[in-house]
A protein has these predicted regions:
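Short linear motifs at protein or domain termini
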Residues: 1-97, 102, 135, 139, ...
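Short helix-capping and inter-helix turn/linker motifs at the boundaries of alpha-helical repeat units
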Residues: 6, 104-105, 169-172
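Short helix-capping/hinge motifs at transmembrane helix termini and TM-loop junctions
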Residues: 96-97, 142, 166-167
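Conserved amphipathic alpha-helical segments that form helical-bundle/coiled-coil interaction surfaces
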Residues: 80, 101-162, 176-184, 192-203
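Short alpha-helical transmembrane interface motifs in multi-pass membrane proteins
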Residues: 73-74, 160-164
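Mobile beta-alpha loop/short-helix "lid" or hinge segments that flank ligand
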Residues: 54-60, 153-155, 169-172
Length: 214
């Protein structure tokens, strides 16, 4: 059972990585047989991975058309960004009340790992740690029913960000942007944490002033 779960997790992670990095592009058709050969796993493992990716909003499965990578619709991206902003801000006060010293130590370690990924130029690794960081804070609020929605929002944010290379920050800056969030959480200041998270989401893509005004 453990080996089967490891194979499923590995296949899911591999396909997700290719979608996020735009190696599998919007509209691409994915076949279970083809992916099974590429990933050296069973079609059943691929099928389960695609179901998880559908829950993430990264693929859509249709009986007669197969499985396709979802589009990156700018309007949908903006809606998901706003939804993410609201979910994280809503969780902030509860998280600030419940965070423990052990929780903070784990988040400090995540921040250090983000710094290391940035220094190594590992953009995808940094994005994966970013998800871990935000979910670790969100889970303190114990709003389990909203977690899958938040994951979907964050993954879509990452895809959109990687599609806007002109507005991407240096990786070191991306990592450092999490420090004000961590500081507010360490102070158990729910209002400050909500503001820090809202600012973080609002400024994920570093848009040029002329484009902000348009």
């Amino acid at each position: 059972m453990a080996a089967r779960q490891q194979a499923l997790d590995a296949a899911y992670a591999a396909i997700k990585r290719r979608i996020i990095l735009n190696e599998l592009k919007p509209g691409d058709t994915l076949t279970e047989l083809g992916l099974a050969k590429e990933l050296d796993c069973s079609q059943g493992t691929v099928r389960e991975s695609l179901l998880r990716l559908q829950a993430d909003g990264l693929v859509v499965r249709s009986g007669h058309r197969g499985t396709m990578v979802t589009d990156l619709d700018p309007e949908v991206a903006n809606e998901l960004l706003e939804l993410r902003r609201r979910i994280e801000a809503r969780a902030a006060r509860r998280a600030a009340e419940r965070v423990t010293a052990a929780d903070l130590a784990a988040l400090v370690e995540l921040q250090a790992r983000m710094d290391a990924a940035a220094a190594a130029g590992d953009e995808y690794g940094l994005l994966a740690l970013d998800i871990d960081f935000h979910l670790a804070i969100f889970r303190l609020a114990r709003l389990d029913a909203l977690e899958q929605i938040l994951v979907r929002c964050i993954l879509h944010t990452h895809r959109s960000k990687l599609w806007a290379p002109r507005h991407r920050r240096p990786l070191a800056q991306t990592s450092m942007r999490h420090r004000p969030i961590l500081a507010a959480l360490a102070a158990h200041d729910g209002a400050a944490l909500a503001r820090a998270l809202e600012h973080h989401v609002d400024t994920i893509v570093d848009v040029a002033p002329a484009e902000q005004a348009s």
